[in-house]
Amino acid sequence: LTFAVENGSAGQSAVVDLGIAESQIIAVQDQAAALMEVAAGTSDACVIDITMANAMTGEGTSYADLAPGISLTSEEYGIGFRKGSDVTAKVNELMAKWKADGTLQALADKYSLTLAE
């Protein structure tokens, strides 16, 4: 099997960590190119972010015959600031407000994401 991955991505690291041989890994410019490799038949599978996979595959997309398969890793993202920044408290207040009023959940629902605690 061959796996298309975005060069330098977490997906590439995941397949390397799984022990997939370098000869089976096709590194491409971006995640959209990884999907194109599968659609073109030049790769058996691709490893991309689940958000991208959900948005770009399945019914109503250019890749209607493709679907997300398995999850290899979990990635979480955060917001970072310089140590001691007064912006941290302001952003924390805003995030707490958005969580309480349902704004964050609405965004998560809109983009088929799971809201982290």
Region roles according to the model:
Residues 17-20, 32-47, 51, 59:
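Short helices/loops that flank or line small-molecule/ion binding pockets
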Residues 10-25, 65-71, 95-117:
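Ligand-binding clefts/hinges and TM-proximal coupling segments of bilobed small-molecule sensing domains
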Residues 12, 32-35, 39, 50-54, ...:
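Extracytoplasmic/secreted envelope proteins and their assembly/folding machinery
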Residues 5, 23-30:
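Short beta-strand-to-loop elements that line the ligand-binding cleft
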Residues 50, 54-96, 114-117:
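Periplasmic-binding protein-like
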Residues 1-8:
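Short loop->beta-strand "edge-of-pocket" segments that line small-molecule binding or catalytic clefts
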